[in-house]
A protein has these predicted regions:
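Sec-dependent signal peptide recognition
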Residues: 2-9
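C-terminal motif of bacterial Sec signal peptides marking the signal peptidase cleavage site
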Residues: 12-15
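Post-signal peptide N-terminal segment of mature Sec-exported envelope proteins
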Residues: 24-51
Length: 190
């Protein structure tokens, strides 16, 4: 028993820093204001990858893969004059077209923090993998981006002054395709 007590005391002391973090995470004070609005940029919310060399012919049989951002959710925490800490969940839907070469495909996407006026404050790039089960042409996943930190000048600056925007990394041709209103949905009619 005498050996057990010092070991227990050492374990408790070693855990002090993590105990402080746990106590901070259990803070029950209300946020100083609303969380930033979150969503996908309309022109960058979907992507159609055509088979190599077929970009000139935007027809269904040349589609390799498609992707769409279907939902974006933000969770945040901030009190007093502390920075706003947020995380974002992004739901993706994917399609595998007739010209697909494999059972998986990587898509690049970005997450940006902007002022409500549209000025981009920060932008990070990520990759999401579309993994298609055997025989399936549809897939989906949810990606979580943790620890988005938005500094605030003082406690009067609320999360509603910012937006968190998500979109696919698009080539000039893919962006033009989207802006022309063209789209192929591999799940249409299913």
């Amino acid at each position: 028993m005498r050996i057990f007590v010092p070991i227990l005391a050492l374990a408790l002391l070693a855990g002090c820093s993590s105990t402080k973090k746990l106590a901070e995470s259990l803070d029950t004070r209300q946020n100083s204001g609303a969380c930033p609005a979150a969503g996908s940029l309309y022109d960058a919310a979907r992507i159609v990858d055509f088979a190599s060399g077929s970009q000139d012919e935007n027809i269904y049989t040349n589609i390799a893969y498609t992707g769409e951002i279907t939902d974006v959710r933000t969770f945040c925490r901030y009190t007093a004059d502390h920075p706003l800490e947020a995380e974002v969940e992004v739901d993706f839907a994917f399609g595998k077209g007739p010209a697909a070469a494999g059972a998986s495909h990587d898509f690049g996407y970005w997450v940006a923090v902007t002022r409500r006026s549209g000025k981009v404050l920060a932008k990070e790039h990520y990759t999401v993998q579309a993994a298609f089960k055997s025989g399936s042409k549809l897939a989906g996943t949810t990606e979580r981006v943790n620890r988005i930190t938005i500094p605030r000048a003082d406690e009067t600056i609320a999360g509603s002054n910012f937006e968190i925007i998500v979109g696919f990394d698009l080539s000039d041709e893919q962006l033009a395709f989207n802006r022309e209103g063209k789209r192929f949905r591999l799940d249409a009619g299913q």
